[in-house]
Amino acid sequence: MKRAYTAFIVLGVMVAAFIVASPAYATFPGHNGRIAFQADTGAGNQIYTVRPNGHGLFQVTHVKPAAAGIDPGTSGATTPDWSPDGHWIAFSLNECTVARIHPNGTGLRVVASQTPGGCETDPAFTPDGHHLVFERFDPATNDDAIWIMGLNGEGRRRVGTGPGGAATPEVSPDGQTVTFLSFTPPDDLTAIFAVGIHGGPVRQVTPTLNGITFKHDWAPDGSRLVMSDNAGNPDLPVNVVTIRPDGTGLKYLTDNQTPDQRAFAGSYSPNGKWIVFRQERGDQSALMVMRTNGQGMHAILPFSDFRPRSIDWGPVPS
């Protein structure tokens, strides 16, 4: 995300060692396929996929490192999102360009920006697979908002924004609602907001929970949202929580107790029975899954220096 243009850079700098800005995407109903995520290769980020059993780790993208002046933490290929049919992965290219690619690494498509000097980032598919929602920052107007466009950039339209900008859009499985992250006054902590896909009134869905992390996701049946808490304080543990779209029924799924224990939500599985997330212990990370009630937790990729981020569980290609 081009946080240098918006207040979102403040949070990214404050907790750069704590979280990584990651968009959130709806998981659409289907059979469980491969899990996509970004990881740092030492020369920028790339998109990877892996089977739910931890086998078949595959590097999808091989993009060139960003030019000077772009945050290394967001350069390369970041923020993957699966298309509903499993044939495409949308992602952010070097922070401020929308792109998509087939999961076998072929067919790269880059959407030309229509925001001179600005940023278009964090794409997520709509349930019909024909459109992308994304964050757009226009320095000419200082407008940071959620937009929607066709897969090739056609038919662009502004959807809405929150009290402190808008980031990490996600469309509900029924295609009617877009949720996104925004800063809230007076403490500039992040919360999730919602707006209709055609625009209209914006409402706050979640409490701030000391700052919601950038990644959140809809359950495939639209009944709940998953996210993590405590983005605003690196001296606190991070836990995965779920909530109903009307803001009721907050439920904690993990029970980390110390600041070196951090669970960062990824997404629901397409069959709606699992949640994938990153568990951190100190400087080690593991790709984990658990049932939607927090039970059955186990590792897909064990604890190591390899750090999966912006995790999105895709469907078996139709």
List the predicted regions and their residue ranges:
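Secretory targeting and sorting signals
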Residues: 2-26
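Sequence signature of WD/YWTD-type beta-propeller architectures
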Residues: 21-318
